[in-house]
């Protein structure tokens, strides 16, 4: 459960990402594909090379979902319900892969915002991403 301080930290961190969220989403995806090659199996039809339009496009989708979650911190299950259905029933993404992407998102934010990504912000964003993952995997059962 996110505390009031966590919510403040998440909103502030995501506010820094701002209009460039899609770029950071794509950077995190590229990082994930390089670090955890098994995650590429969900994207056999994508050009996964650095800077590809498909990775950038999916990065925007990831960023949009996270922006929706930030806007609905108190009601993420409803805000992400359709996305949860998609990942559980159609795409059948391994729940572990959400943790891998979360890690890559944290690394991306820490690398791109070193002074703003304090230990407290890191902890709050980590809790937020874990909450998003829990929501996205809730319909697997």
Curated annotation (Swiss-Prot):
GO terms for molecular function: heme binding; iron ion binding; oxygen binding; oxygen carrier activity. Disulfide bonds: none annotated. GO terms for cellular component: haptoglobin-hemoglobin complex; hemoglobin complex. Pfam families: Globin. Keywords: Heme, Iron, Metal-binding, Oxygen transport, Transport. Red blood cells. Signal peptide: none annotated. InterPro entries: Globin (IPR000971), Globin-like_sf (IPR009050), Globin/Proto (IPR012292), Hemoglobin_a-typ (IPR002338), Hemoglobin_oxygen_transport (IPR050056), Hemoglobin_pi (IPR002339). GO terms for biological process: cellular oxidant detoxification; hydrogen peroxide catabolic process. O2 binds at residue 58. Residues 1-141 form the Globin domain. SUPFAM superfamilies: Globin-like. The keyword Transport applies. It comes from the Eukaryota. Heme b binds at residue 87. Heterotetramer of two alpha chains and two beta chains. Involved in oxygen transport from the lung to the various peripheral tissues. Belongs to the globin family. PANTHER family: HEMOGLOBIN FAMILY MEMBER, HEMOGLOBIN SUBUNIT ALPHA-3. This is Hemoglobin subunit alpha-3.
